[in-house]
């Protein structure tokens, strides 16, 4: 064998590898001690471990043990990923809380006295306000203590910070709720520390974090309204002057309320006007103990989807039940005179169409967990002023339409979660959705009466 040539684990080229023995015994032998390529003749077939029945039973036991070991490993791995914990190390949640409490890093600090929200500096490297000790050192500490890789010169930038932020966003015990810029020009992200009760139930985590989502969307509507990152391609952006009179303030309050229609399989089942000014959460009801779960009571501005009506078609009824079960975490909406923002937690595809969608485009797929502006009243009002009788189009329509699809099934041949590209490809047919929502700001609904 050449010095650089590696040995072939399957023997010589062209040789037929021996089948491993599934029964218990020493390597290379059967359960009775005979070689694996020569069946044992000490017992007749079907009698004892070396027989046909014994080998099959031993093989089934071995397969079950392997499947159990793989299942336990997968469960442990998912738990380790969700909590950020590893052997001999604390969880990511406990680690970052310890770093915030230490006060060693400028800008890494608590945002409230209850110590439920903290800031992480994220000033870009090219920004003149970038400071290594504030914006980069914590990322290097993360790599050194938890990254399981050597720290070299490449981590002098923001590479370590990017890895740390990715780990924080994957952690179930933390929730990214916003971002901002301090008075001295430094950028930061805001994370919320979830309560232990929220980590046991995914719906409870969404309900408890709904207030923070509402505040984040309200901030985007007020401050980040003209940010290019919040605008879709081809979207028209026109500012609205602030109102200072009493009538103007009342009108601003009305813009925070929404008129909602709900359709099941093409038939209207419910309509309502929301009462909360901060926002609303549309979800299906869950039968859980209110003393233990937040999700049984709902968030502020809770809107429950109606129960499944009596349908003659069992297939349609089953699809409707699956869609409502997928909407347990729900959809969050916040409205103002600057538009409507939405955060989708629906466990399935949700398509929407409104005047923020380009005129030559069809319904778009809502991203999961990301604030998205789905309606701009300024576009509707400006278009109405320019043309009293505009052509029928979703750009000139005063409402938003949402199609809630059933969960995307993962095939038996692909046990992994679908990639975003595959997910979008499977969700391309929005017409299959059996739950449809029509959402309109209250002032526009009042004007149409």
UniProtKB/Swiss-Prot annotation:
Keywords: Host cytoplasm, Host-virus interaction, Inhibition of host innate immune response by virus, Inhibition of host IRF3 by virus, Inhibition of host RLR pathway by virus, Ubl conjugation, Viral immunoevasion. The keyword Glycosyltransferase does not apply. ISGylated. Residues 1-60 are annotated as: Disordered. InterPro entries: Interferon_reg_fact_DNA-bd_dom, Interferon_reg_factor-3, SMAD-like_dom_sf, SMAD_FHA_dom_sf, WH-like_DNA-bd_sf, WH_DNA-bd_sf. Pfam families: IRF, IRF-3. The modification N6-propionyllysine is found at residues 406, 442. GO terms for molecular function: DNA-binding transcription factor activity, RNA polymerase II-specific; protein domain specific binding; protein sequestering activity; RNA polymerase II cis-regulatory region sequence-specific DNA binding. The keyword Ubl conjugation applies. PROSITE patterns: IRF_2 (PS51507). One of its GO terms (biological process) is symbiont-mediated suppression of host innate immune response. Its main location: host cell. It is found in: Host cytoplasm. One of its GO terms (cellular component) is host cell cytoplasm. Residues 89-195 bind DNA. Forms homodimers. Interacts with host IRF3, IRF7, and CREBBP. Interacts with host SYNCRIP. Interacts with host USP7. Interacts (via C-terminus) with host HERC5. Interacts with host GABARAPL1. Interacts with host SIRT6. Belongs to the IRF family. PANTHER family: INTERFERON REGULATORY FACTOR, IRF TRYPTOPHAN PENTAD REPEAT DOMAIN-CONTAINING PROTEIN. Plays a role in the inhibition of host innate response by repressing the expression of interferon-inducible genes and blocking host IRF1- and IRF3-mediated transcription. Blocks the interaction between host IRF3 and CREBBP. Regulates the host cellular metabolism by increasing glucose uptake, ATP production and lactate secretion through down-regulation of heterogeneous nuclear ribonuclear protein Q1/SYNCRIP. Mechanistically, induces ubiquitination and degradation of SYNCRIP through the ubiquitin-proteasome pathway by recruiting KLHL3/CUL3 ubiquitin ligase complex. This is VIRF-1. It comes from Human herpesvirus 8 type P (isolate GK18). The lineage of its organism: Viruses, Duplodnaviria, Heunggongvirae, Peploviricota, Herviviricetes.
């Amino acid at each position: 064998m050449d010095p650089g040539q590696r040995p072939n684990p399957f023997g010589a080229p062209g040789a037929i590898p021996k089948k491993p023995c599934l029964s218990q015994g020493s390597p290379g032998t059967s359960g009775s001690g005979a070689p694996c390529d020569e069946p044992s003749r000490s017992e007749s077939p079907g009698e004892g471990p070396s027989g046909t029945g014994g080998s099959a039973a031993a093989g089934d036991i071995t397969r079950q043990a392997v499947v159990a070991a793989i299942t336990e490993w997968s469960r442990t791995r998912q738990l380790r990923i969700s909590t950020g914990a590893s052997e001999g190390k604390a969880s990511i949640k406990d680690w970052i809380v310890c770093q915030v409490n230490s006060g060693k890093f400028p800008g890494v600090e608590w945002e409230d006295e209850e110590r439920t929200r903290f800031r992480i500096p994220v000033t870009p490297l090219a920004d003149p306000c970038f400071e290594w000790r504030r914006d980069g050192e914590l990322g290097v500490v993360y790599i050194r203590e938890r990254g399981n890789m050597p720290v070299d010169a490449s981590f002098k930038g923001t590479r370590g910070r990017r890895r740390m932020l990715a780990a924080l966003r994957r952690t179930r015990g933390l929730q990214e709720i916003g971002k901002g810029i301090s008075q001295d020009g430094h950028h930061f992200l805001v994370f919320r520390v979830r309560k232990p009760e929220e980590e046991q139930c995914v719906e409870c985590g969404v309900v408890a974090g709904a207030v923070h989502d509402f505040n984040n969307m309200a901030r985007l509507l007020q401050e980040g309204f003209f940010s290019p990152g919040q605008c879709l391609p081809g979207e028209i952006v026109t500012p609205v002057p602030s109102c200072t009179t009493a009538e103007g303030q009342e009108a601003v309050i009305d813009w925070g309320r929404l008129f909602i229609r709900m359709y099941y399989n093409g038939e209207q089942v419910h309509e309502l006007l929301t009462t909360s000014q901060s926002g609303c959460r549309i979800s299906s009801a869950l039968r859980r103990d209110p003393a233990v779960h937040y999700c049984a009571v709902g968030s502020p501005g809770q809107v429950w989807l109606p129960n499944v009506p009596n349908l003659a078609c069992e297939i349609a009824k089953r699809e409707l039940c699956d869609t409502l079960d997928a909407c347990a975490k729900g959809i969050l909406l916040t409205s103002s005179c600057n538009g409507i923002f939405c955060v989708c937690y629906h466990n399935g595809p949700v398509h929407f169409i409104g005047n923020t969608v380009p005129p030559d485009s069809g319904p778009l797929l809502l991203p999961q967990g990301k604030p998205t502006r789905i309606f701009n009243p300024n576009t509707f009002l400006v278009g109405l002023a320019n043309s009293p009788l505009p052509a029928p189009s979703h750009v000139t329509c005063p409402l938003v339409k949402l199609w809630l699809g059933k969960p995307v099934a993962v095939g038996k041949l692909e046990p992994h979660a679908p990639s975003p590209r595959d997910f979008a490809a499977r969700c391309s047919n929005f017409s299959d959705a059996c739950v449809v929502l029509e959402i309109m700001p209250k002032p526009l609904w009042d004007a149409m009466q």
